[in-house]
Each structure stands twice: as structure tokens, then as C-alpha cells.
């Protein structure tokens, strides 16, 4: 209906142009759903936007637009309100058409080709493989998966990618943590990884010892040259890593790989069990092995953007909008994570995607400027890269906040959360709020079977419709949707009419919470309808029309939940 109104407005404006009231047609004519039913079904502010061009007040221009608006059986009346808003009241017959369209199109209703097949690379989660995915990561998982589904629904081709941070110091700390548990040392550094999963990996190593995983294993670490009483904990862990590498020789890499692969395997299983699939798993180590990061630094040097200070190589990111210059090669010759990120993002651009989207935790906000600076320095358009931020999650149990830390091993894993409350609840709770807002995950509410639990509330609406339709299906030959004229039926039909716009808005603005809130509202309208109206009445036309209406509601609930990765149970 929005498209129809836009077309009719164009025809009205063309008449005004022919009469020299307007000089040009605007590029975009905005028509929105009215928030207040008393103000009609749709509204447009076009008169206020064009009043200066027309050299008259917006209210006068609105009246002229109305006077030249083409007759349409779909538009019952037009009102001018306020400074010049144009409100449209649609006819009952035009509103009711949505029910038939939904029934005809089924699972395809709402899908579009706005994206026109543009290729999108969507990177999300990319958590360090230093431990299992926890509840903090889960929000990025659910959000990224929902964004991917929504973009595909409006015609984009989306590839999902996970960037595996399998190189660098944190991976060395993981390896030394596993090895120290393997050799059962009594003194375990505070800044090693302490979770039970470290013990589990160490036990796995013991289990494969028969396969000769080690040739240089020595469980005596007393001779290692480390400053055990050093106040500098970071220096202490670096000494441990250096001694472990020296002691194990080539076997160190076996520990390193075994630890990372064990965790990465669990992450992949966890994501698959959560219903999330990736097209690519991109290894940071591949950038090290290929020498690509060195090539990038050399290229930046040739462009004059690298300078040396205190033995390190610095990238002049301030020339491209960053607030500070950044180190790309430390004074010890080791490349920084940033240098690998530059190489990784350059590779993304070279793969030919139309859009590149990163979903990062909100704590990476300060990283955006330097990454975009590197893209600009390498002569690519930084606006092609969109970075979406996901805020932190606080988990509450019995009204108390659950403290979590990956390094200390004190955290609730995503798997544990899913097993406690179920995939559907976890997904929906994660995306119910705008991703840039902090989120409190209430475990008690998540486990409740009440109307306050939004997942239960929506799925229960779907189940109720299933129950009604088991007692009688609509007979299509005996339907007259114009008999659906009570207030609750009108509300439901108008809400169904909003679905296409909600879907497009959710997709193009990367806001799955908009669709989630819509589904909760639609479910609420249905529950009111269910509690106040009978469906299996004696009047054939009324019975069949009501059954058709709730069938359409059921279809939209299914379509929306499917896009969010939520199931539609037939019974509860």
C-alpha cells in the first residue's frame, strides 16, 4: 500500500508541476505507517518538504496535493492535520487484501529483491579461541545470524565469516596454560587461563601420548629461567612462554595447535548446535605464514605512511582521521595485531564484495578509526566497510548479577545457557533489544512459561492458532473478508499490513529487534482476539473469514520467527 500511495502522490505532484506550482519532483517521497489509528493508516510529510519550492505554507501545499490526488478505490479519505501532514485512510477492502496475499504467498510473503543480488561479507563473533563461547559472545552470534537472514530476505547474497585469531601472544598464553596443566605444576600463574576446559585439554593430550605427540616432554619446570617473584606478571608469563618453546622445541607447536584446535572444534560444534553456519573460517595464522602483513607494511612504507620511532614502525593513521598514529611492527620485530587486521581487511576488499560488514563488541569502538584509516590509505573506500557494535550482556540469576571472566575461568558458557533455557529463548532474548544498548539477561524470566516471557508469548499465539485450525480449516469458496469489521479484526489486519515494511526496515537498518518487537505486538493482538471472539461460529462466511485471518497471522508469525532463527512448535 505504501508503494501505491507513493505512486498516487507522484501523479498529484506532476499536476502541480504542470501548473508551475512545483519546479521539480523530489527523489524520495516518504510514506509511513501512522502511529495513531485516529490519524489514519499512512501519513506523509511531503508538503512540508516542498513548501519552500512551492513558495507557500506547507498546509496550503498539502491542500493542493489533496485536491489533485487521483481517485482510488483503495483510499477512503485524506485528511490534512497540523502544519501540513497528509493522513491517508485506506478502504476496508484494500486493507483486507493483505490476508489473501499472505495466504497465496505463504513463506515467501514479505521477501523482496531490494538488494538485487549484491554480495555481502558479514563477519561476526570472531571470538579468540582461548576458551569456549560464553554468554557475552552469544549476543553477537544471535545478532549476526539474524542480520544475515534478514539481508537474504530482501535480496542480498550474504557470506558469513569467522576470523580465527590463532596467532599472537594470547595463543601462546593458551598453549602455556595447557602445558602447565599437563605437567601438573604446583605454581600456576595468575594470568594464565584457569578454566576447567584447560584441564580437559591437558587430559586429552595425556590420552594421545601413545600417538607420540611429544618427543621432548619434560615435566620438570624447575630449571626454567623465569623470574618467579617478579612483580611484572606479564614479564613472568613471557619468560614461561620463552622457556616452554626452548624446552619443547618443535613439540611446542604441537601443544599450541592441539590447544587451539580443541577449542575451535568446540566453538564450531557450539555454533552448529545453535543453528549458526559460516561459509568461511579465516585463519590469522595464514596472514603470518603468507607474509601478507609484511607486504602491507612494505606497501605503506612505499606510500610514505610509515615512520620509525624508538625502534618500532609506526603508521601515520592520523593522516586519515585517526586520533593517534599506530604501531604496526614492534621494536622486537614482531608485527602487531593491527598489522594483521590491515592485511585481513585489504583481503576482504580484494575479494570483490559490494558490502563488507563487521560486527564487533562495543569495547572495540576505538578500533574503528584506525581500521578505516588503513583502508583509506590503501586507496579503498572506507565507507564500504560498515562496523556494527554489540553491547555487553549482564546475566542475572535470582535477581543477582553473575560475574564472569574468561581468564579466571569464571563464566557461563553459551552451551550451558542454551541447555538451561533453550535455543529459542536465548536467540530471542539476545535480539529483543537494540544491539547498541546494554542488555540484562534475566534467567528467571527466560525459564518462565508466562506471558511476560516474550518467546513463550509469541509461540503460544502460534500454538493457539494451530489448535483452532485443527478443529476447522477455512473453506476458501465461502469467504468475505469485509465481514471482518470489529475493532480487534481491524487491528490485526492493519498490523499484518505492516509486516513488509517492518521486514525491510529491520534488514536495511540491521535491526532485528524491530522485527522481534513487531512479532510480540502481533501476538498480543491475536491473544486479545482469541480471548474475545469465537471462531467456529454458525455463520459460514464469518467463520471461514475469521479462520482465514488467523491463518494469515500464523503465517506471518512463522515467517518472522524463521528469519530470527526461532522455531514454531505445534503444541506446548
Swiss-Prot record:
<dbReference type="InterPro" id="IPR009080">
    <property type="entry name" value="tRNAsynth_Ia_anticodon-bd"/>
</dbReference>
<comment type="subunit">
    <text>Monomer.</text>
</comment>
<dbReference type="InterPro" id="IPR008909">
    <property type="entry name" value="DALR_anticod-bd"/>
</dbReference>
<dbReference type="InterPro" id="IPR001412">
    <property type="entry name" value="aa-tRNA-synth_I_CS"/>
</dbReference>
<dbReference type="Pfam" id="PF03485">
    <property type="entry name" value="Arg_tRNA_synt_N"/>
</dbReference>
<keyword id="KW-0436">Ligase</keyword>
<dbReference type="InterPro" id="IPR035684">
    <property type="entry name" value="ArgRS_core"/>
</dbReference>
<dbReference type="InterPro" id="IPR014729">
    <property type="entry name" value="Rossmann-like_a/b/a_fold"/>
</dbReference>
<dbReference type="Pfam" id="PF05746">
    <property type="entry name" value="DALR_1"/>
</dbReference>
<dbReference type="GO" id="GO:0006420">
    <property type="term" value="P:arginyl-tRNA aminoacylation"/>
</dbReference>
<dbReference type="InterPro" id="IPR001278">
    <property type="entry name" value="Arg-tRNA-ligase"/>
</dbReference>
<keyword id="KW-0963">Cytoplasm</keyword>
<dbReference type="GO" id="GO:0005737">
    <property type="term" value="C:cytoplasm"/>
</dbReference>
<dbReference type="InterPro" id="IPR005148">
    <property type="entry name" value="Arg-tRNA-synth_N"/>
</dbReference>
<keyword id="KW-0067">ATP-binding</keyword>
<keyword id="KW-0648">Protein biosynthesis</keyword>
<dbReference type="Pfam" id="PF00750">
    <property type="entry name" value="tRNA-synt_1d"/>
</dbReference>
<dbReference type="InterPro" id="IPR036695">
    <property type="entry name" value="Arg-tRNA-synth_N_sf"/>
</dbReference>
<keyword id="KW-0547">Nucleotide-binding</keyword>
<protein>
    <recommendedName>
        <fullName>Arginine--tRNA ligase</fullName>
        <ecNumber>6.1.1.19</ecNumber>
    </recommendedName>
</protein>
<dbReference type="GO" id="GO:0004814">
    <property type="term" value="F:arginine-tRNA ligase activity"/>
</dbReference>
<dbReference type="GO" id="GO:0005524">
    <property type="term" value="F:ATP binding"/>
</dbReference>
<comment type="similarity">
    <text>Belongs to the class-I aminoacyl-tRNA synthetase family.</text>
</comment>
<feature type="short sequence motif" description="'HIGH' region">
    <location>
        <begin position="127"/>
        <end position="137"/>
    </location>
</feature>
<keyword id="KW-0030">Aminoacyl-tRNA synthetase</keyword>
Amino acid at each position: 500500500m505504501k508503494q501505491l500511495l507513493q505512486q498516487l502522490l507522484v501523479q498529484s505532484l506532476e499536476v502541480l508541476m504542470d501548473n508551475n506550482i512545483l519546479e521539480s519532483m523530489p527523489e524520495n517521497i516518504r510514506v509511513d505507517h501512522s502511529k495513531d489509528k485516529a490519524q489514519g493508516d499512512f501519513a506523509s510529510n511531503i508538503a512540508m518538504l516542498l513548501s519552500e519550492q512551492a513558495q507557500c505554507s506547507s498546509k496550503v501545499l498539502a491542500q493542493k496535493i489533496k485536491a489533485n490526488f487521483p481517485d482510488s478505490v483503495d483510499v477512503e479519505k485524506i485528511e490534512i492535520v497540523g502544519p501540513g501532514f497528509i493522513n491517508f485512510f485506506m478502504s476496508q477492502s484494500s486493507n483486507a487484501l493483505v490476508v489473501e496475499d499472505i495466504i497465496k504467498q505463504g513463506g515467501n510473503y514479505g521477501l523482496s529483491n531490494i538488494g538485487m543480488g549484491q554480495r555481502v561479507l558479514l563477519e561476526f563473533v570472531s571470538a579468540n579461541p582461548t576458551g569456549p563461547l560464553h554468554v557475552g559472545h552469544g549476543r553477537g552470534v544471535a545478532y549476526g545470524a539474524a542480520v544475515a537472514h534478514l539481508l537474504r530476505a530482501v535480496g542480498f547474497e550474504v557470506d558469513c565469516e569467522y576470523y580465527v585469531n590463532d596467532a599472537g601472544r594470547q595463543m601462546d598464553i593458551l598453549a602455556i596454560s595447557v602445558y602447565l596443566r599437563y605437567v601438573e605444576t604446583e605454581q600456576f600463574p595468575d594470568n594464565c587461563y584457569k578454566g576447567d576446559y584447560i584441564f580437559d585439554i591437558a587430559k586429552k593430550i595425556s590420552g594421545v601420548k601413545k600417538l607420540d605427540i611429544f618427543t621432548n616432554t619434560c615435566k620438570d619446570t624447575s630449571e626454567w629461567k623465569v623470574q618467579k617473584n617478579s612483580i611484572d606478571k606479564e614479564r613472568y608469563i613471557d619468560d614461561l612462554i620463552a622457556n616452554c618453546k626452548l624446552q619443547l622445541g618443535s613439540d611446542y607447536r604441537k601443544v599450541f595447535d592441539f590447544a587451539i584446535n580443541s577449542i575451535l572444534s568446540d566453538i564450531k560444534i557450539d555454533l552448529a548446535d545453535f543453528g549458526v553456519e559460516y561459509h568461511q573460517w579465516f585463519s590469522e595464522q595464514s596472514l603470518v605464514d603468507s607474509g601478507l602483513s609484511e607486504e602491507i607494511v612494505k606497501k605503506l612504507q612505499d606510500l610514505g605512511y610509515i615512520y620509525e620511532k624508538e625502534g618500532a614502525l609506526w603508521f601515520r593513521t592520523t593522516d586519515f582521521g585517526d586520533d593517534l598514529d599506530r604501531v604496526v611492527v614492534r621494536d622486537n620485530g614482531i608485527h602487531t595485531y593491527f598489522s594483521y587486521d590491515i592485511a585481513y581487511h585489504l583481503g576482504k576488499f580484494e575479494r570483490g564484495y559490494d558490502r563488507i560488514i563487521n560486527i564487533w563488541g562495543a569495547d572495540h569502538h576505538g578500533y574503528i578509526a584506525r581500521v578505516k584509516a588503513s583502508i583509506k590509505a590503501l586507496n579503498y573506500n572506507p565507507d564500504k566497510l560498515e562496523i556494527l557494535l554489540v553491547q555487553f550482556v549482564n546475566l542475572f540469576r535470582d535477581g543477582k548479577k553473575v560475574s564472569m571472566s574468561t581468564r579466571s575461568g569464571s563464566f557461563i558458557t553459551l552451551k550451558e545457557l542454551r541447555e538451561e533455557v533453550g535455543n529459542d529463548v536465548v536467540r530471542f532474548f539476545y535480539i529483543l533489544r537494540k544491539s547498541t544498548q546494554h542488555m540484562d539477561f534475566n534467567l528467571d524470566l527466560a525459564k518462565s512459561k508466562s506471558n511476560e516471557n516474550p518467546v513463550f508469548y509469541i509461540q503460544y499465539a502460534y500454538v493457539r492458532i494451530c489448535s483452532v485450525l485443527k478443529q476447522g480449516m477455512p473453506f476458501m469458496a465461502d469467504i468475505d473478508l469485509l465481514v471482518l469489521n470489529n475493532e480487534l479484526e481491524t487491528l490485526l489486519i492493519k498490523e499484518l499490513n505492516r509486516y513488509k515494511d517492518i521486514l525491510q526496515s529491520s534488514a536495511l537498518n540491521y535491526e532485528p529487534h524491530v522485527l522481534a518487537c513487531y512479532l510480540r505486538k502481533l501476538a498480543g493482538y491475536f491473544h486479545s482476539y482469541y480471548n474475545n471472539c469465537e471462531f467456529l461460529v454458525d455463520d459460514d462466511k464469518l467463520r471461514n473469514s475469521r479462520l482465514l485471518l488467523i491463518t494469515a497471522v500464523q503465517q506471518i508469525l512463522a515467517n518472522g520467527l524463521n528469519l530470527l532463527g526461532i522455531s514454531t512448535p505445534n503444541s506446548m
